[in-house]
Design a protein with these regions (language model features):
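Nudix hydrolase/Nudix homology domain
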Residues: 24-29, 94-117
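Conserved beta-strand segments that form the floor/walls of ligand-binding pockets within enzyme
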Residues: 30, 64, 85-87, 116
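Structural detector for helix-capping/boundary residues
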Residues: 7, 34, 48, 89, ...
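Active-site-adjacent beta-strand/loop module that shapes the phosphate/pyrophosphate-binding cleft
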Residues: 4, 69-95, 105
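The catalytic Nudix box helix
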Residues: 31-66
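Conserved hydrophobic "DFG−1" position in protein kinase catalytic cores
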Residues: 11-12, 20, 87-88, 106
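Conserved N-terminal beta-strand and adjoining loop/helix that marks the start
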Residues: 1-18, 35
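Acidic surface patches and DE-rich sequence motifs
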Residues: 13, 23, 73-75
Length: 117
């Protein structure tokens, strides 16, 4: 099984909801983030992808390492995805999804009924 490396950022609001995005090519919501370009660091990958996907500029000092997680890739059969995830300090304002993102939503991780993750 081939592996895909990605980096992502967790944004939470004051009620504990998590900001997630849904790409136009997928029914599932996920954290904003994506694949590295060249020899880009994980932090810089997460920052660039977040800016590209939802228009939020993040400073590296606002991030702390949350962990690295591996799971089956949801939209690439025969692959696993290893996500290096960072936690953002503070609540971002006005995410603006770009062309590849169908929607951005604040999702309660304890009650995500009707939302495919």
């Amino acid at each position: 099984m081939s592996n895909i490396d990605v980096a992502a950022i967790v944004f939470t609001d004051d009620t504990g909801r998590v900001l997630c995005v849904r790409k136009r090519t997928s029914p599932r919501f996920q954290l904003p983030g994506g694949k590295p370009e060249g020899d880009e660091t994980k932090v810089h990958t997460a920052i660039r992808e977040t800016r590209e996907e939802i228009g939020i500029d993040v400073d590296a000092e606002q991030l702390s390492y949350l962990g690295t997680f591996t799971a089956k890739a949801s939209n690439e059969p025969g692959h696993t995805v290893t996500s290096t995830v960072f936690l953002h300090v503070g609540v971002p304002t006005d995410p603006a999804p770009d062309a590849e993102i169908a929607e951005a939503a604040w999702i309660d991780p304890a009650d995500h009924t009707g939302v495919e993750l």
